[in-house]
Amino acid sequence: MIEVPYATVAQRLMAGIIDLMIISVISMPIFIFTAKYSLFVQFSLATSSAVVLMTLYYSLTEGALSTSPGKKMMNLYILDSDSFRPISYRQALVRNIIRMADASLLYLPMVLNKDRRRIGDGAAGTIVVSKRRLSVRVISPEEYKKRKMVEGGAYSMDLAVAEALIDKIKEKASTFPAEKLENTIKYIERGIKIDEIKRRSMETIGSDDPCSILAFSVLAGYIPARSILSQQDFVDILEKASLFAFSQEERRSLSIKAGVLRGIDEAERYTKPFRLNILLRSMWDSPRLFREITPFFLASFFILLFSAFFAMWMPSDIVSQLKELMGKENISMPGPFVTAIMIILNNIKVWLLLYGGGPLIIASPSVTAINGVILGSVGGLLMREGRALDFLSAVLPHGVMEVTAILIASSIGIKMGLSLIFPGEKSRYESLKEVAMRYSDLVVLSAVLLFIAGFVEAFITPILMHEHSIAITVSILEIIVLYLFLLKSK
């Protein structure tokens, strides 16, 4: 049976606990900073920053290192499921946004799947492997001789590994300076007489030269292989053993282990820098990707619109409830800058819920409908008070960009849900991965829109609220510029 050294549920749980402890320490200044504000502000900043901070923490650490601090302590690494190479920043981002769906299901997919992949792993095309579970059996010299006689050229996995190990040690030892090789042999002599070693080396390997003695000593356990061989050498051993093994299944198993170890070695030796051109390239590709999801964007728009119209004519006390939550007049309220941060974080949280909830099928349209109900309830209440223009002036300047970003996330979420229902000839994870990875570039565009919308809402909207003609004119210009960019063709 071909076995990939997947991380166990217990290992991933321990790694997650460690990471959550680190995230909690990082987020402590946020709780201290918001203590002077009302409960509404504290709750909004705490929940939004927790979701955003967790997504950033995992995406940046896993993108750069193919592991997180918690996983590193548990010797766990995240690799591409096809190539076994370290993952990209894009894969790290996708697997951690989709964490929303996994958390909603209490991570049951990870527990139930044999490969311990959660939905986020399926969407990003990743696996989590354990370096501790990546091992092969090294047989004793006596067993090596016996198997060599019995198996002939039809090597089993154990014999293939032993043969490749001997060849690699002899090759490595031949490059040692004479003094180093001599000192190593003297170290071995401390535990066993050199004549005995030479005799057994000749019987086992067929030679008693210093390189063969060294290879025999490793096989016999007199010295650890890691004192001579590097991690890359072990990769070479597994690759060579995969050529020696007779069984096709064992060749495949050894090849997989070699690939996994190579990926881990690369992840440990190199840190991927985060380059600005990644963001610029994503922005450049956004219009093309937006045009591809236009039907889903329109569907999300109509869900939002119908929900708003439905709620507009229903009695609602949402505004009064929000005022009550905001606290009494003697409680300190944030200034425009903190308000902008609060709005941006909350909008990003909603965006992540829409995108990350896509695999749950019903989550994205449901969250879109809820936002429509809230918008329609507030709008309907103000319209009944004869303040329709106040409502439009308060919503449109920032709402054009904010709603566009929210609908983009909803569109991708709906498309992901449909990819699971109708996977075609592909597996459901393959179908999900195709959608999630392809449209991940729209994350950058959406983040930019939400940042701009947050600052507009905090700094500009209060100025334009009673300047109806200016607010509506600015909003129309925003629509023209934004959608000319999104719908442009090369």
How would you name each of these model-derived features?
Residues 1-241, 247, 260:
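Membrane-interfacial and juxtamembrane segments of integral membrane proteins
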Residues 2-12, 275-293, 338, 428-433:
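Cytosolic juxtamembrane amphipathic/interface segments immediately preceding
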Residues 91, 380-472:
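Hydrophobic alpha-helical transmembrane segments and adjacent short intramembrane/lumenal linkers
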Residues 240-292:
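Cytosolic juxtamembrane regions of integral membrane proteins
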Residues 291-317:
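N-terminal signal-anchor transmembrane alpha helix
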Residues 308-332, 370:
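Interfacial/capping segments of alpha-helical transmembrane domains
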Residues 337-401, 408:
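Pore-lining transmembrane helices
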Residues 468-482:
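Small-residue-rich transmembrane alpha-helices that serve as helix-helix interface/gating elements
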